[in-house]
């Protein structure tokens, strides 16, 4: 959530930044006018209340003097009626301002490339060289079916489109991957957490999914509960409405969880395979940091995600997202895109973002600065470390052999009971 004071005092700069995220200047101008109206009404209310207090004192004095108070009582009633009417108007204005501040996206950092969409993203670096095959590489969905480890047909029968069963070494591979990821993040100082997979609406508001993106979630009908779209939600809200000790920052959390997404607006995109599912496992990283340290922490978090891909020897590239492609809560985002041979393309496998104080303001996560004793909003960061299903897809395609088998990456073999190959 944006700071209304920042919008008020630095309006032109904020408007210019938000315009790069598709926010119409007319929206901000309307917000500015409503905010000015609110402040004028507040002045009127305080003036009227002061007058009412004066009249009340005069009534008390008149009663002590046994004087007639009818006129003064009538005047006080009129003042009270005016205050009541203005309070009602203020409530409407506050609701409108809340709607503005909770639905406007975060302000992009100066280092974020300006652009309309993903075509304007900027590649930062690459790692590894895509493998050259001496045979036609298969898509991971075909490999998975041929190996008997992925079953979309029965997933569709039991649930519906974009669901599947992992079987045998497929299930073992999925488990090996997320255990490996959690172990690697643990070495980097992350505390492993098992979170609830259901959260309340306040938690969804805290991280920015609500109210704007309700259509992307699975709500439990007639309840205050939602299936988590990412472990970012429970991990970040762990400290909601709390004040942390500044000397304890930064704090690192990691968790593996299922993620549930309706994929509204994704009709026709990635209809086959593991790239876009309604339910998938993901290992998440979340950080709580002091403002002056958050961008250094973003670079470290991105490196933590890269470490997984490097140890799995999967070629990838790092991309800085443009202002038009970043997520709602982010002020800066790096995407990691892994090479998918059958698509001859890099596909997103991780997204690492600094939200600065955007989520912390919504969730009221603060810290007491040990330097001056003041309570301040901290910065929150989140990143995938990694999306597990997409990692399975990348391994199946990059490690496939001409006979249809798939070699298991060396880093995962200790987690696979020593198995080296998945054979048809």
UniProtKB/Swiss-Prot annotation:
It is an enzyme of class 6 (ligase). It is found in: Cytoplasm. Its EC number is 6.1.1.11. It catalyses: tRNA(Ser) + L-serine + ATP = L-seryl-tRNA(Ser) + AMP + diphosphate + H(+); tRNA(Sec) + L-serine + ATP = L-seryl-tRNA(Sec) + AMP + diphosphate + H(+). Its main location: cytoplasm. GO terms for molecular function: ATP binding; catalytic activity, acting on a protein; serine-tRNA ligase activity; transferase activity. The keyword Lipid biosynthesis does not apply. One of its GO terms (cellular component) is cytoplasm. L-serine binds at residues 230-232, 284, 384. CDD domains: SerRS_core. Pathway: Aminoacyl-tRNA biosynthesis; selenocysteinyl-tRNA(Sec) biosynthesis; L-seryl-tRNA(Sec) from L-serine and tRNA(Sec): step 1/1. ATP binds at residues 261-263, 348-351. Keywords: Aminoacyl-tRNA synthetase, ATP-binding, Cytoplasm, Ligase, Nucleotide-binding, Protein biosynthesis. Pfam families: Seryl_tRNA_N, tRNA-synt_2b. GO terms for biological process: selenocysteine biosynthetic process; seryl-tRNA aminoacylation. InterPro entries: aa-tRNA-synt_IIb, aa-tRNA-synth_II, aa-tRNA-synth_II/BPL/LPL, Ser-tRNA-ligase_type_1, Ser-tRNA-synth_1_N, SerRS_1_N_sf, SerRS_core, tRNA-bd_arm. The keyword Lyase does not apply. Homodimer. The tRNA molecule binds across the dimer. Catalyzes the attachment of serine to tRNA(Ser). Is also able to aminoacylate tRNA(Sec) with serine, to form the misacylated tRNA L-seryl-tRNA(Sec), which will be further converted into selenocysteinyl-tRNA(Sec). Consists of two distinct domains, a catalytic core and a N-terminal extension that is involved in tRNA binding. Belongs to the class-II aminoacyl-tRNA synthetase family. Type-1 seryl-tRNA synthetase subfamily. This is Serine--tRNA ligase. It comes from Streptococcus pneumoniae serotype 2 (strain D39 / NCTC 7466).
């Amino acid at each position: 959530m944006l700071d209304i004071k920042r919008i008020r005092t630095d309006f032109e700069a904020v408007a210019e930044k938000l315009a790069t995220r598709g926010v119409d200047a007319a929206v901000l101008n309307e917000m500015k006018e409503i905010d000015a109206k609110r402040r004028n009404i507040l002045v009127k209310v305080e003036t009227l209340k002061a007058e009412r207090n004066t009249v009340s004192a005069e009534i008390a004095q008149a009663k002590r003097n046994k004087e007639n108070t009818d006129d003064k009582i009538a005047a006080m009633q009129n003042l009270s009626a005016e205050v009541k009417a203005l309070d009602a108007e203020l409530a409407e204005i506050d609701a409108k301002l809340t709607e503005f501040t909770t639905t406007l996206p975060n302000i992009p950092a100066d280092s974020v490339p300006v652009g309309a969409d993903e075509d304007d993203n900027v590649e930062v670096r690459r790692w590894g060289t895509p493998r050259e095959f001496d045979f036609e590489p298969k898509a991971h969905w075909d490999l998975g079916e041929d190996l008997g480890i992925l079953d979309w047909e029965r997933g569709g029968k039991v649930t519906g489109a974009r669901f599947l069963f992992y079987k045998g070494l497929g299930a073992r591979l999925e488990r090996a991957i997320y255990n490996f990821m959690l172990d690697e993040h643990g070495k980097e100082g992350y505390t492993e957490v098992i979170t609830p997979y259901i959260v309340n609406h306040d938690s969804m508001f805290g991280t920015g999914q609500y109210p704007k993106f309700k259509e992307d979630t699975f709500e439990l009908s007639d309840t205050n509960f939602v299936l988590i779209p990412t472990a970012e939600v429970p991990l970040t809200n762990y400290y909601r409405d709390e004040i942390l000790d500044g000397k304890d920052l930064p704090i690192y959390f990691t968790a593996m969880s299922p993620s549930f997404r309706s994929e509204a607006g994704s009709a026709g995109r990635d209809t086959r395979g593991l790239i876009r599912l309604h339910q998938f496992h993901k290992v998440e990283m979340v950080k709580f940091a002091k403002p002056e340290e958050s961008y250094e922490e973003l670079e470290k978090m991105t490196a933590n995600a890269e470490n997984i891909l490097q140890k799995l020897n999967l070629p990838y590239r790092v991309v800085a997202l443009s202002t038009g492609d970043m997520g709602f809560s982010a002020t800066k985002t790096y995407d990691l895109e892994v090479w998918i041979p059958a698509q001859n393309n890099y596909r997103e496998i991780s997204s690492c973002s600094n939200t600065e104080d955007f989520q912390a303001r919504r969730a009221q996560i603060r810290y007491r600065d040990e330097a001056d004793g003041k309570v301040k909003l901290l910065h929150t960061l989140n990143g995938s470390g990694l999306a597990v299903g997409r990692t399975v897809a990348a391994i199946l395609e990059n490690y496939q052999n001409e006979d249809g088998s798939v070699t298991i990456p060396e880093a995962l073999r200790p987690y696979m009971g020593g198995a080296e190959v998945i054979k048809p």
